Curated annotation (Swiss-Prot):
Residues 2-116 form the Response regulatory domain. GO terms for biological process: regulation of DNA-templated transcription. One of its GO terms (cellular component) is cytosol. SUPFAM superfamilies: CheY-like. Phosphorylated by PhoQ. This is Virulence transcriptional regulatory protein PhoP. The lineage of its organism: Bacteria, Pseudomonadati, Pseudomonadota, Gammaproteobacteria, Enterobacterales.
Amino acid sequence: MRVLVVEDNALLRHHLKVQIQDAGHQVDDAEDAKEADYYLNEHLPDIAIVDLGLPDEDGLSLIRRWRSNDVSLPILVLTARESWQDKVEVLSAGADDYVTKPFHIEEVMARMQALMRRNSGLASQVISLPPFQVDLSRRELSINDEVIKLTAFEYTIMETLIRNNGKVVSKDSLMLQLYPDAELRESHTIDVLMGRLRKKIQAQYPQEVITTVRGQGYLFELR
């Protein structure tokens, strides 16, 4: 696995690089957004770890720009901002997960591995509920044969809902899919991801297909 680390603090960047390499992965380390763009385009990383306080372009701006350009790799954010509003902003920008500073390197590694487990390929298989189609091997959602660009976590939610078409999926069940490690779970994350997912679906298919069932969870159903 190739990891892109975007962090302007040289010492922290070095520690992250060493730890990730020791885990058996390849690492490209960038000190600013310009260098990050270069590695993104030239080395095609599998996941990016992005600090928000970059010198040339704010990390949130970088993430939004990548997502608007259909960059779909998982993104883990490093941030010193601790309020729930800041966390919601990070997720709304297109990040898949975040770690607040100060942090233990072990937590960064655990969250990175959790993201990659969610993004790993499966045996070739397609779930078709016209006009919706999920390609399990490519981890892609298509509506009317148009691929919808989803983040790793958005895709996992969509796959889980479609696998349970017509059945209510609890928030706890979705959290388990996203975060197998219990200590990494934060329930409000689902609400943010679900809001993003609904917007992307409605841009291509205006009818409501994901319903919130009060006190129970979420329901995917074609009417």
